[in-house]
């Protein structure tokens, strides 16, 4: 076997010595506001950043991504990859236990991937990220192999993701999957205490955590969907961290001496995608007119107040496959009106924009887009939905308007994760696009381990999407947090996870 590591990875397989658990003076509670309640805390069910802010403190994966975006040993101390790229061998971290006392070993890793790739995983949103894996094999108690059906150049990165977080076999077999979803157990720095759906979830410090005991004694998550309510609770002391901060209230938080605003550039991108199967947006000329009609720079400046960057494709500058030379379709209202007429549309043509109802900032963006479209000749309307309904029904079942909001986290920092899941025929997040040429390009890059060749194909994919007007890329949005200054040692990561292992309170 040989070690393979490219791009962000080092030239050899990573390894690390076991970390000693250092006793900490656990004291204090931090209360965090999450916009949504994931409903299930099972890693294979999730797809939301709100889950990650909780789950990343309960569970660990074989690989960990640090805040500088490097991939490091987690529950795996080291790994090697076979010459054909189809066998990944992991040496596991010894003397690790799940929070219920169950030992972590190769059997737990095999159980985790058997679940992920089996019937349980097929019901959730994570399985499609790991379909290159055929099965897991136990070599010995502290060694496990992942056997692939085909090569996957992004697999190591994916193994730092939510779906690959390791779960306890005996606990799940004894309690059942439904119980596990609401009473999660992992190997992470905090352990489950209590969960009241739609209200709150409480975690306590795991004093036996392999990476060192947390400094806090408790984490409380409150589910608050309204951004203005989160900010009001932050000001009153009801919460310590607001994860949903509307741009319009940033100055309000900054004016409070006890609060800080943290704005982080990460992988999150925002767009309006098109229903390309039916309605007026089936016509590429209409889609072109819509894109030409919207002044994205004005939206970034006036609504986002600079907390975003322009994009020409649905990926940030941090993404592998990003093409700095790809140009956006320019803002040109005159051309938009001409294309509107050329497409045979009449003034007052209705067009519906589906959005997530509790996203106050994007609602303002959508209202601005509607204003631009009205100038061209459309009669736009906004159709808001509750977040969980939007993600589990509106998009995957094709119940959107002609345009629909898409927020994408880009958690692998690789355009494959975005492009394959959003544009390949039959994918959960792709209710409309069926394009054989696009499918072929998406499949081709997944079979290539060569860094430069794969990057070229990913850039071709981005250009193809742009040339065919398949979406309206809006911006790469910063993640904005409001944080009480009494919270110390909290360094929010670019991947939007919040890890509280090193946090403390005054």
Predicted regions: what they are:
Residues 31, 105-112, 141-147, 188-189, ...:
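Alpha-helical secondary-structure segments
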Residues 32, 197, 341-410, 425-426, ...:
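Ligand/substrate-recognition segments at binding pockets and active sites
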Residues 91, 128-170, 194:
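Surface-exposed binding/hinge segments that line
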Residues 160-214, 218, 228, 334:
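Gly/Pro-rich hinge or "lid" segments in bacterial periplasmic/extracellular proteins
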């Amino acid at each position: 076997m040989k070690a393979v590591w490219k791009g962000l990875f080092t030239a050899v397989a990573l390894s690390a010595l076991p970390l000693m658990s250092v006793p900490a003076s656990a004291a204090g509670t931090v209360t965090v506001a999450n916009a949504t309640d994931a409903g299930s805390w099972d890693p294979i069910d999730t797809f939301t950043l709100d889950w990650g802010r909780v789950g990343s403190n309960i569970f660990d994966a074989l690989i960990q991504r640090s805040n500088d975006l490097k991939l490091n040993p987690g529950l795996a101390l080291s790994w090697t990859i076979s010459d054909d790229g189809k066998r990944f061998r992991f040496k596991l971290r010894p003397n690790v236990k799940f929070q219920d006392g169950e030992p972590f070993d190769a059997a737990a890793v095999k159980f985790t991937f058997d679940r992920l790739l089996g019937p349980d995983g097929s019901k959730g949103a994570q399985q499609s990220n790991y379909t290159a894996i055929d099965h897991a094999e136990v070599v010995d108690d502290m060694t496990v192999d992942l056997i692939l059906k085909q090569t996957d150049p992004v697999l190591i990165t994916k193994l730092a993701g939510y779906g690959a977080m390791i779960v306890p076999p005996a606990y799940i077999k004894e309690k059942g999957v439904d119980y596990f979803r609401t009473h999660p157990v992992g190997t992470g720095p905090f352990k489950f205490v209590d969960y009241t759906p739609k209200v709150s979830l409480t975690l306590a410090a795991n004093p036996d955590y392999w990476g060192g005991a947390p400094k806090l004694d408790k984490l409380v998550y409150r589910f608050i969907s309204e951004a203005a309510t989160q900010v009001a609770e932050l000001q009153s002391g009801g919460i310590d961290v607001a994860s949903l901060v509307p741009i319009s209230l940033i100055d309000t938080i900054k004016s409070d001496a006890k609060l800080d605003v943290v704005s982080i550039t990460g992988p999150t991108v925002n767009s309006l995608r098109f229903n390309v199967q039916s309605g007026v947006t089936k016509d590429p000329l209409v889609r072109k007119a819509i894109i030409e009609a919207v002044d994205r720079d004005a939206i970034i400046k006036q609504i986002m107040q600079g907390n975003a960057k322009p994009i020409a494709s649905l990926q940030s500058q941090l993404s592998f496959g990003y093409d700095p030379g790809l140009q956006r379709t320019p803002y040109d209202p005159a051309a938009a009106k001409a294309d509107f007429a050329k497409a045979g549309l009449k003034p007052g043509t209705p067009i519906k924009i589906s959005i997530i109802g509790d996203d106050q900032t994007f609602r303002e963006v959508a209202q601005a887009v509607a204003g631009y479209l009205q100038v061209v000749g459309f009669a736009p309307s906004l159709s808001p939905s509750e977040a969980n309904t939007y993600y589990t029904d509106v998009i995957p079942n094709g119940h959107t308007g002609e345009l629909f909001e898409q927020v994408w986290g880009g958690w692998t920092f690789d355009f494959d994760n975005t492009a394959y899941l959003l544009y390949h025929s039959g994918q959960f997040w792709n209710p409309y696009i069926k394009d054989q040429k696009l499918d072929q390009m998406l499949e081709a890059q997944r079979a290539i381990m060569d860094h430069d060749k794969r990057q070229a194909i990913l850039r071709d994919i981005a250009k193809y999407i742009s040339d065919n007007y398949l979406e309206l890329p809006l911006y790469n949005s910063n993640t904005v947090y409001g944080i009480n200054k009494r919270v110390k040692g909290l360094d929010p990561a670019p991947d939007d996870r919040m890890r509280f292992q090193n946090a403390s309170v005054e």
